Regions:
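Interaction-mediating elements
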Residues: 1-114
Length: 114
């Protein structure tokens, strides 16, 4: 794993062990998949930047950008996060209530899917 990915895991999952790590070389740039012992799945870009995190048990809210957390708390009280997907232009979250929200780089809501 690239250094930034290792640091992300050590910082956000202290003491948690990995059960699976894979490098996908089939793309123009390698991508990495990490599955933690608690079932959380993380995906990282070739540079080690987080691109996706998912867990059926829920993702700790502190791993989600504050603006998105606040929006969800305000509009979907009680909903948790089960997936967070990052790409160059958007952030997408899937909630425990099955709502899917897409935000632009300025954290403005641009799409909702239920």
């Amino acid at each position: 794993l690239p250094s930034p990915a290792k640091v992300y895991i050590q910082t956000n999952f202290p003491g948690e062990k990995t059960s699976f790590v894979a490098k996908d070389d089939d793309l123009a740039f390698a991508e990495y998949t990490v599955i933690m012992m608690n079932g959380t799945k993380l995906e990282f870009s070739h540079s080690g930047a987080l691109s996706k995190i998912s867990s059926s048990d829920g993702i700790p809210a502190e791993l989600i950008p504050e603006s998105i957390r606040e929006y969800v708390q305000r509009h979907y009280p009680g909903a948790g996060f089960v997936e967070f997907d990052i790409d160059r232009r958007t952030y997408e979250v899937k909630l425990t209530n099955r709502m899917e929200l897409k935000f632009n780089n300025n954290f403005h809501l641009i799409a909702v899917d239920d």
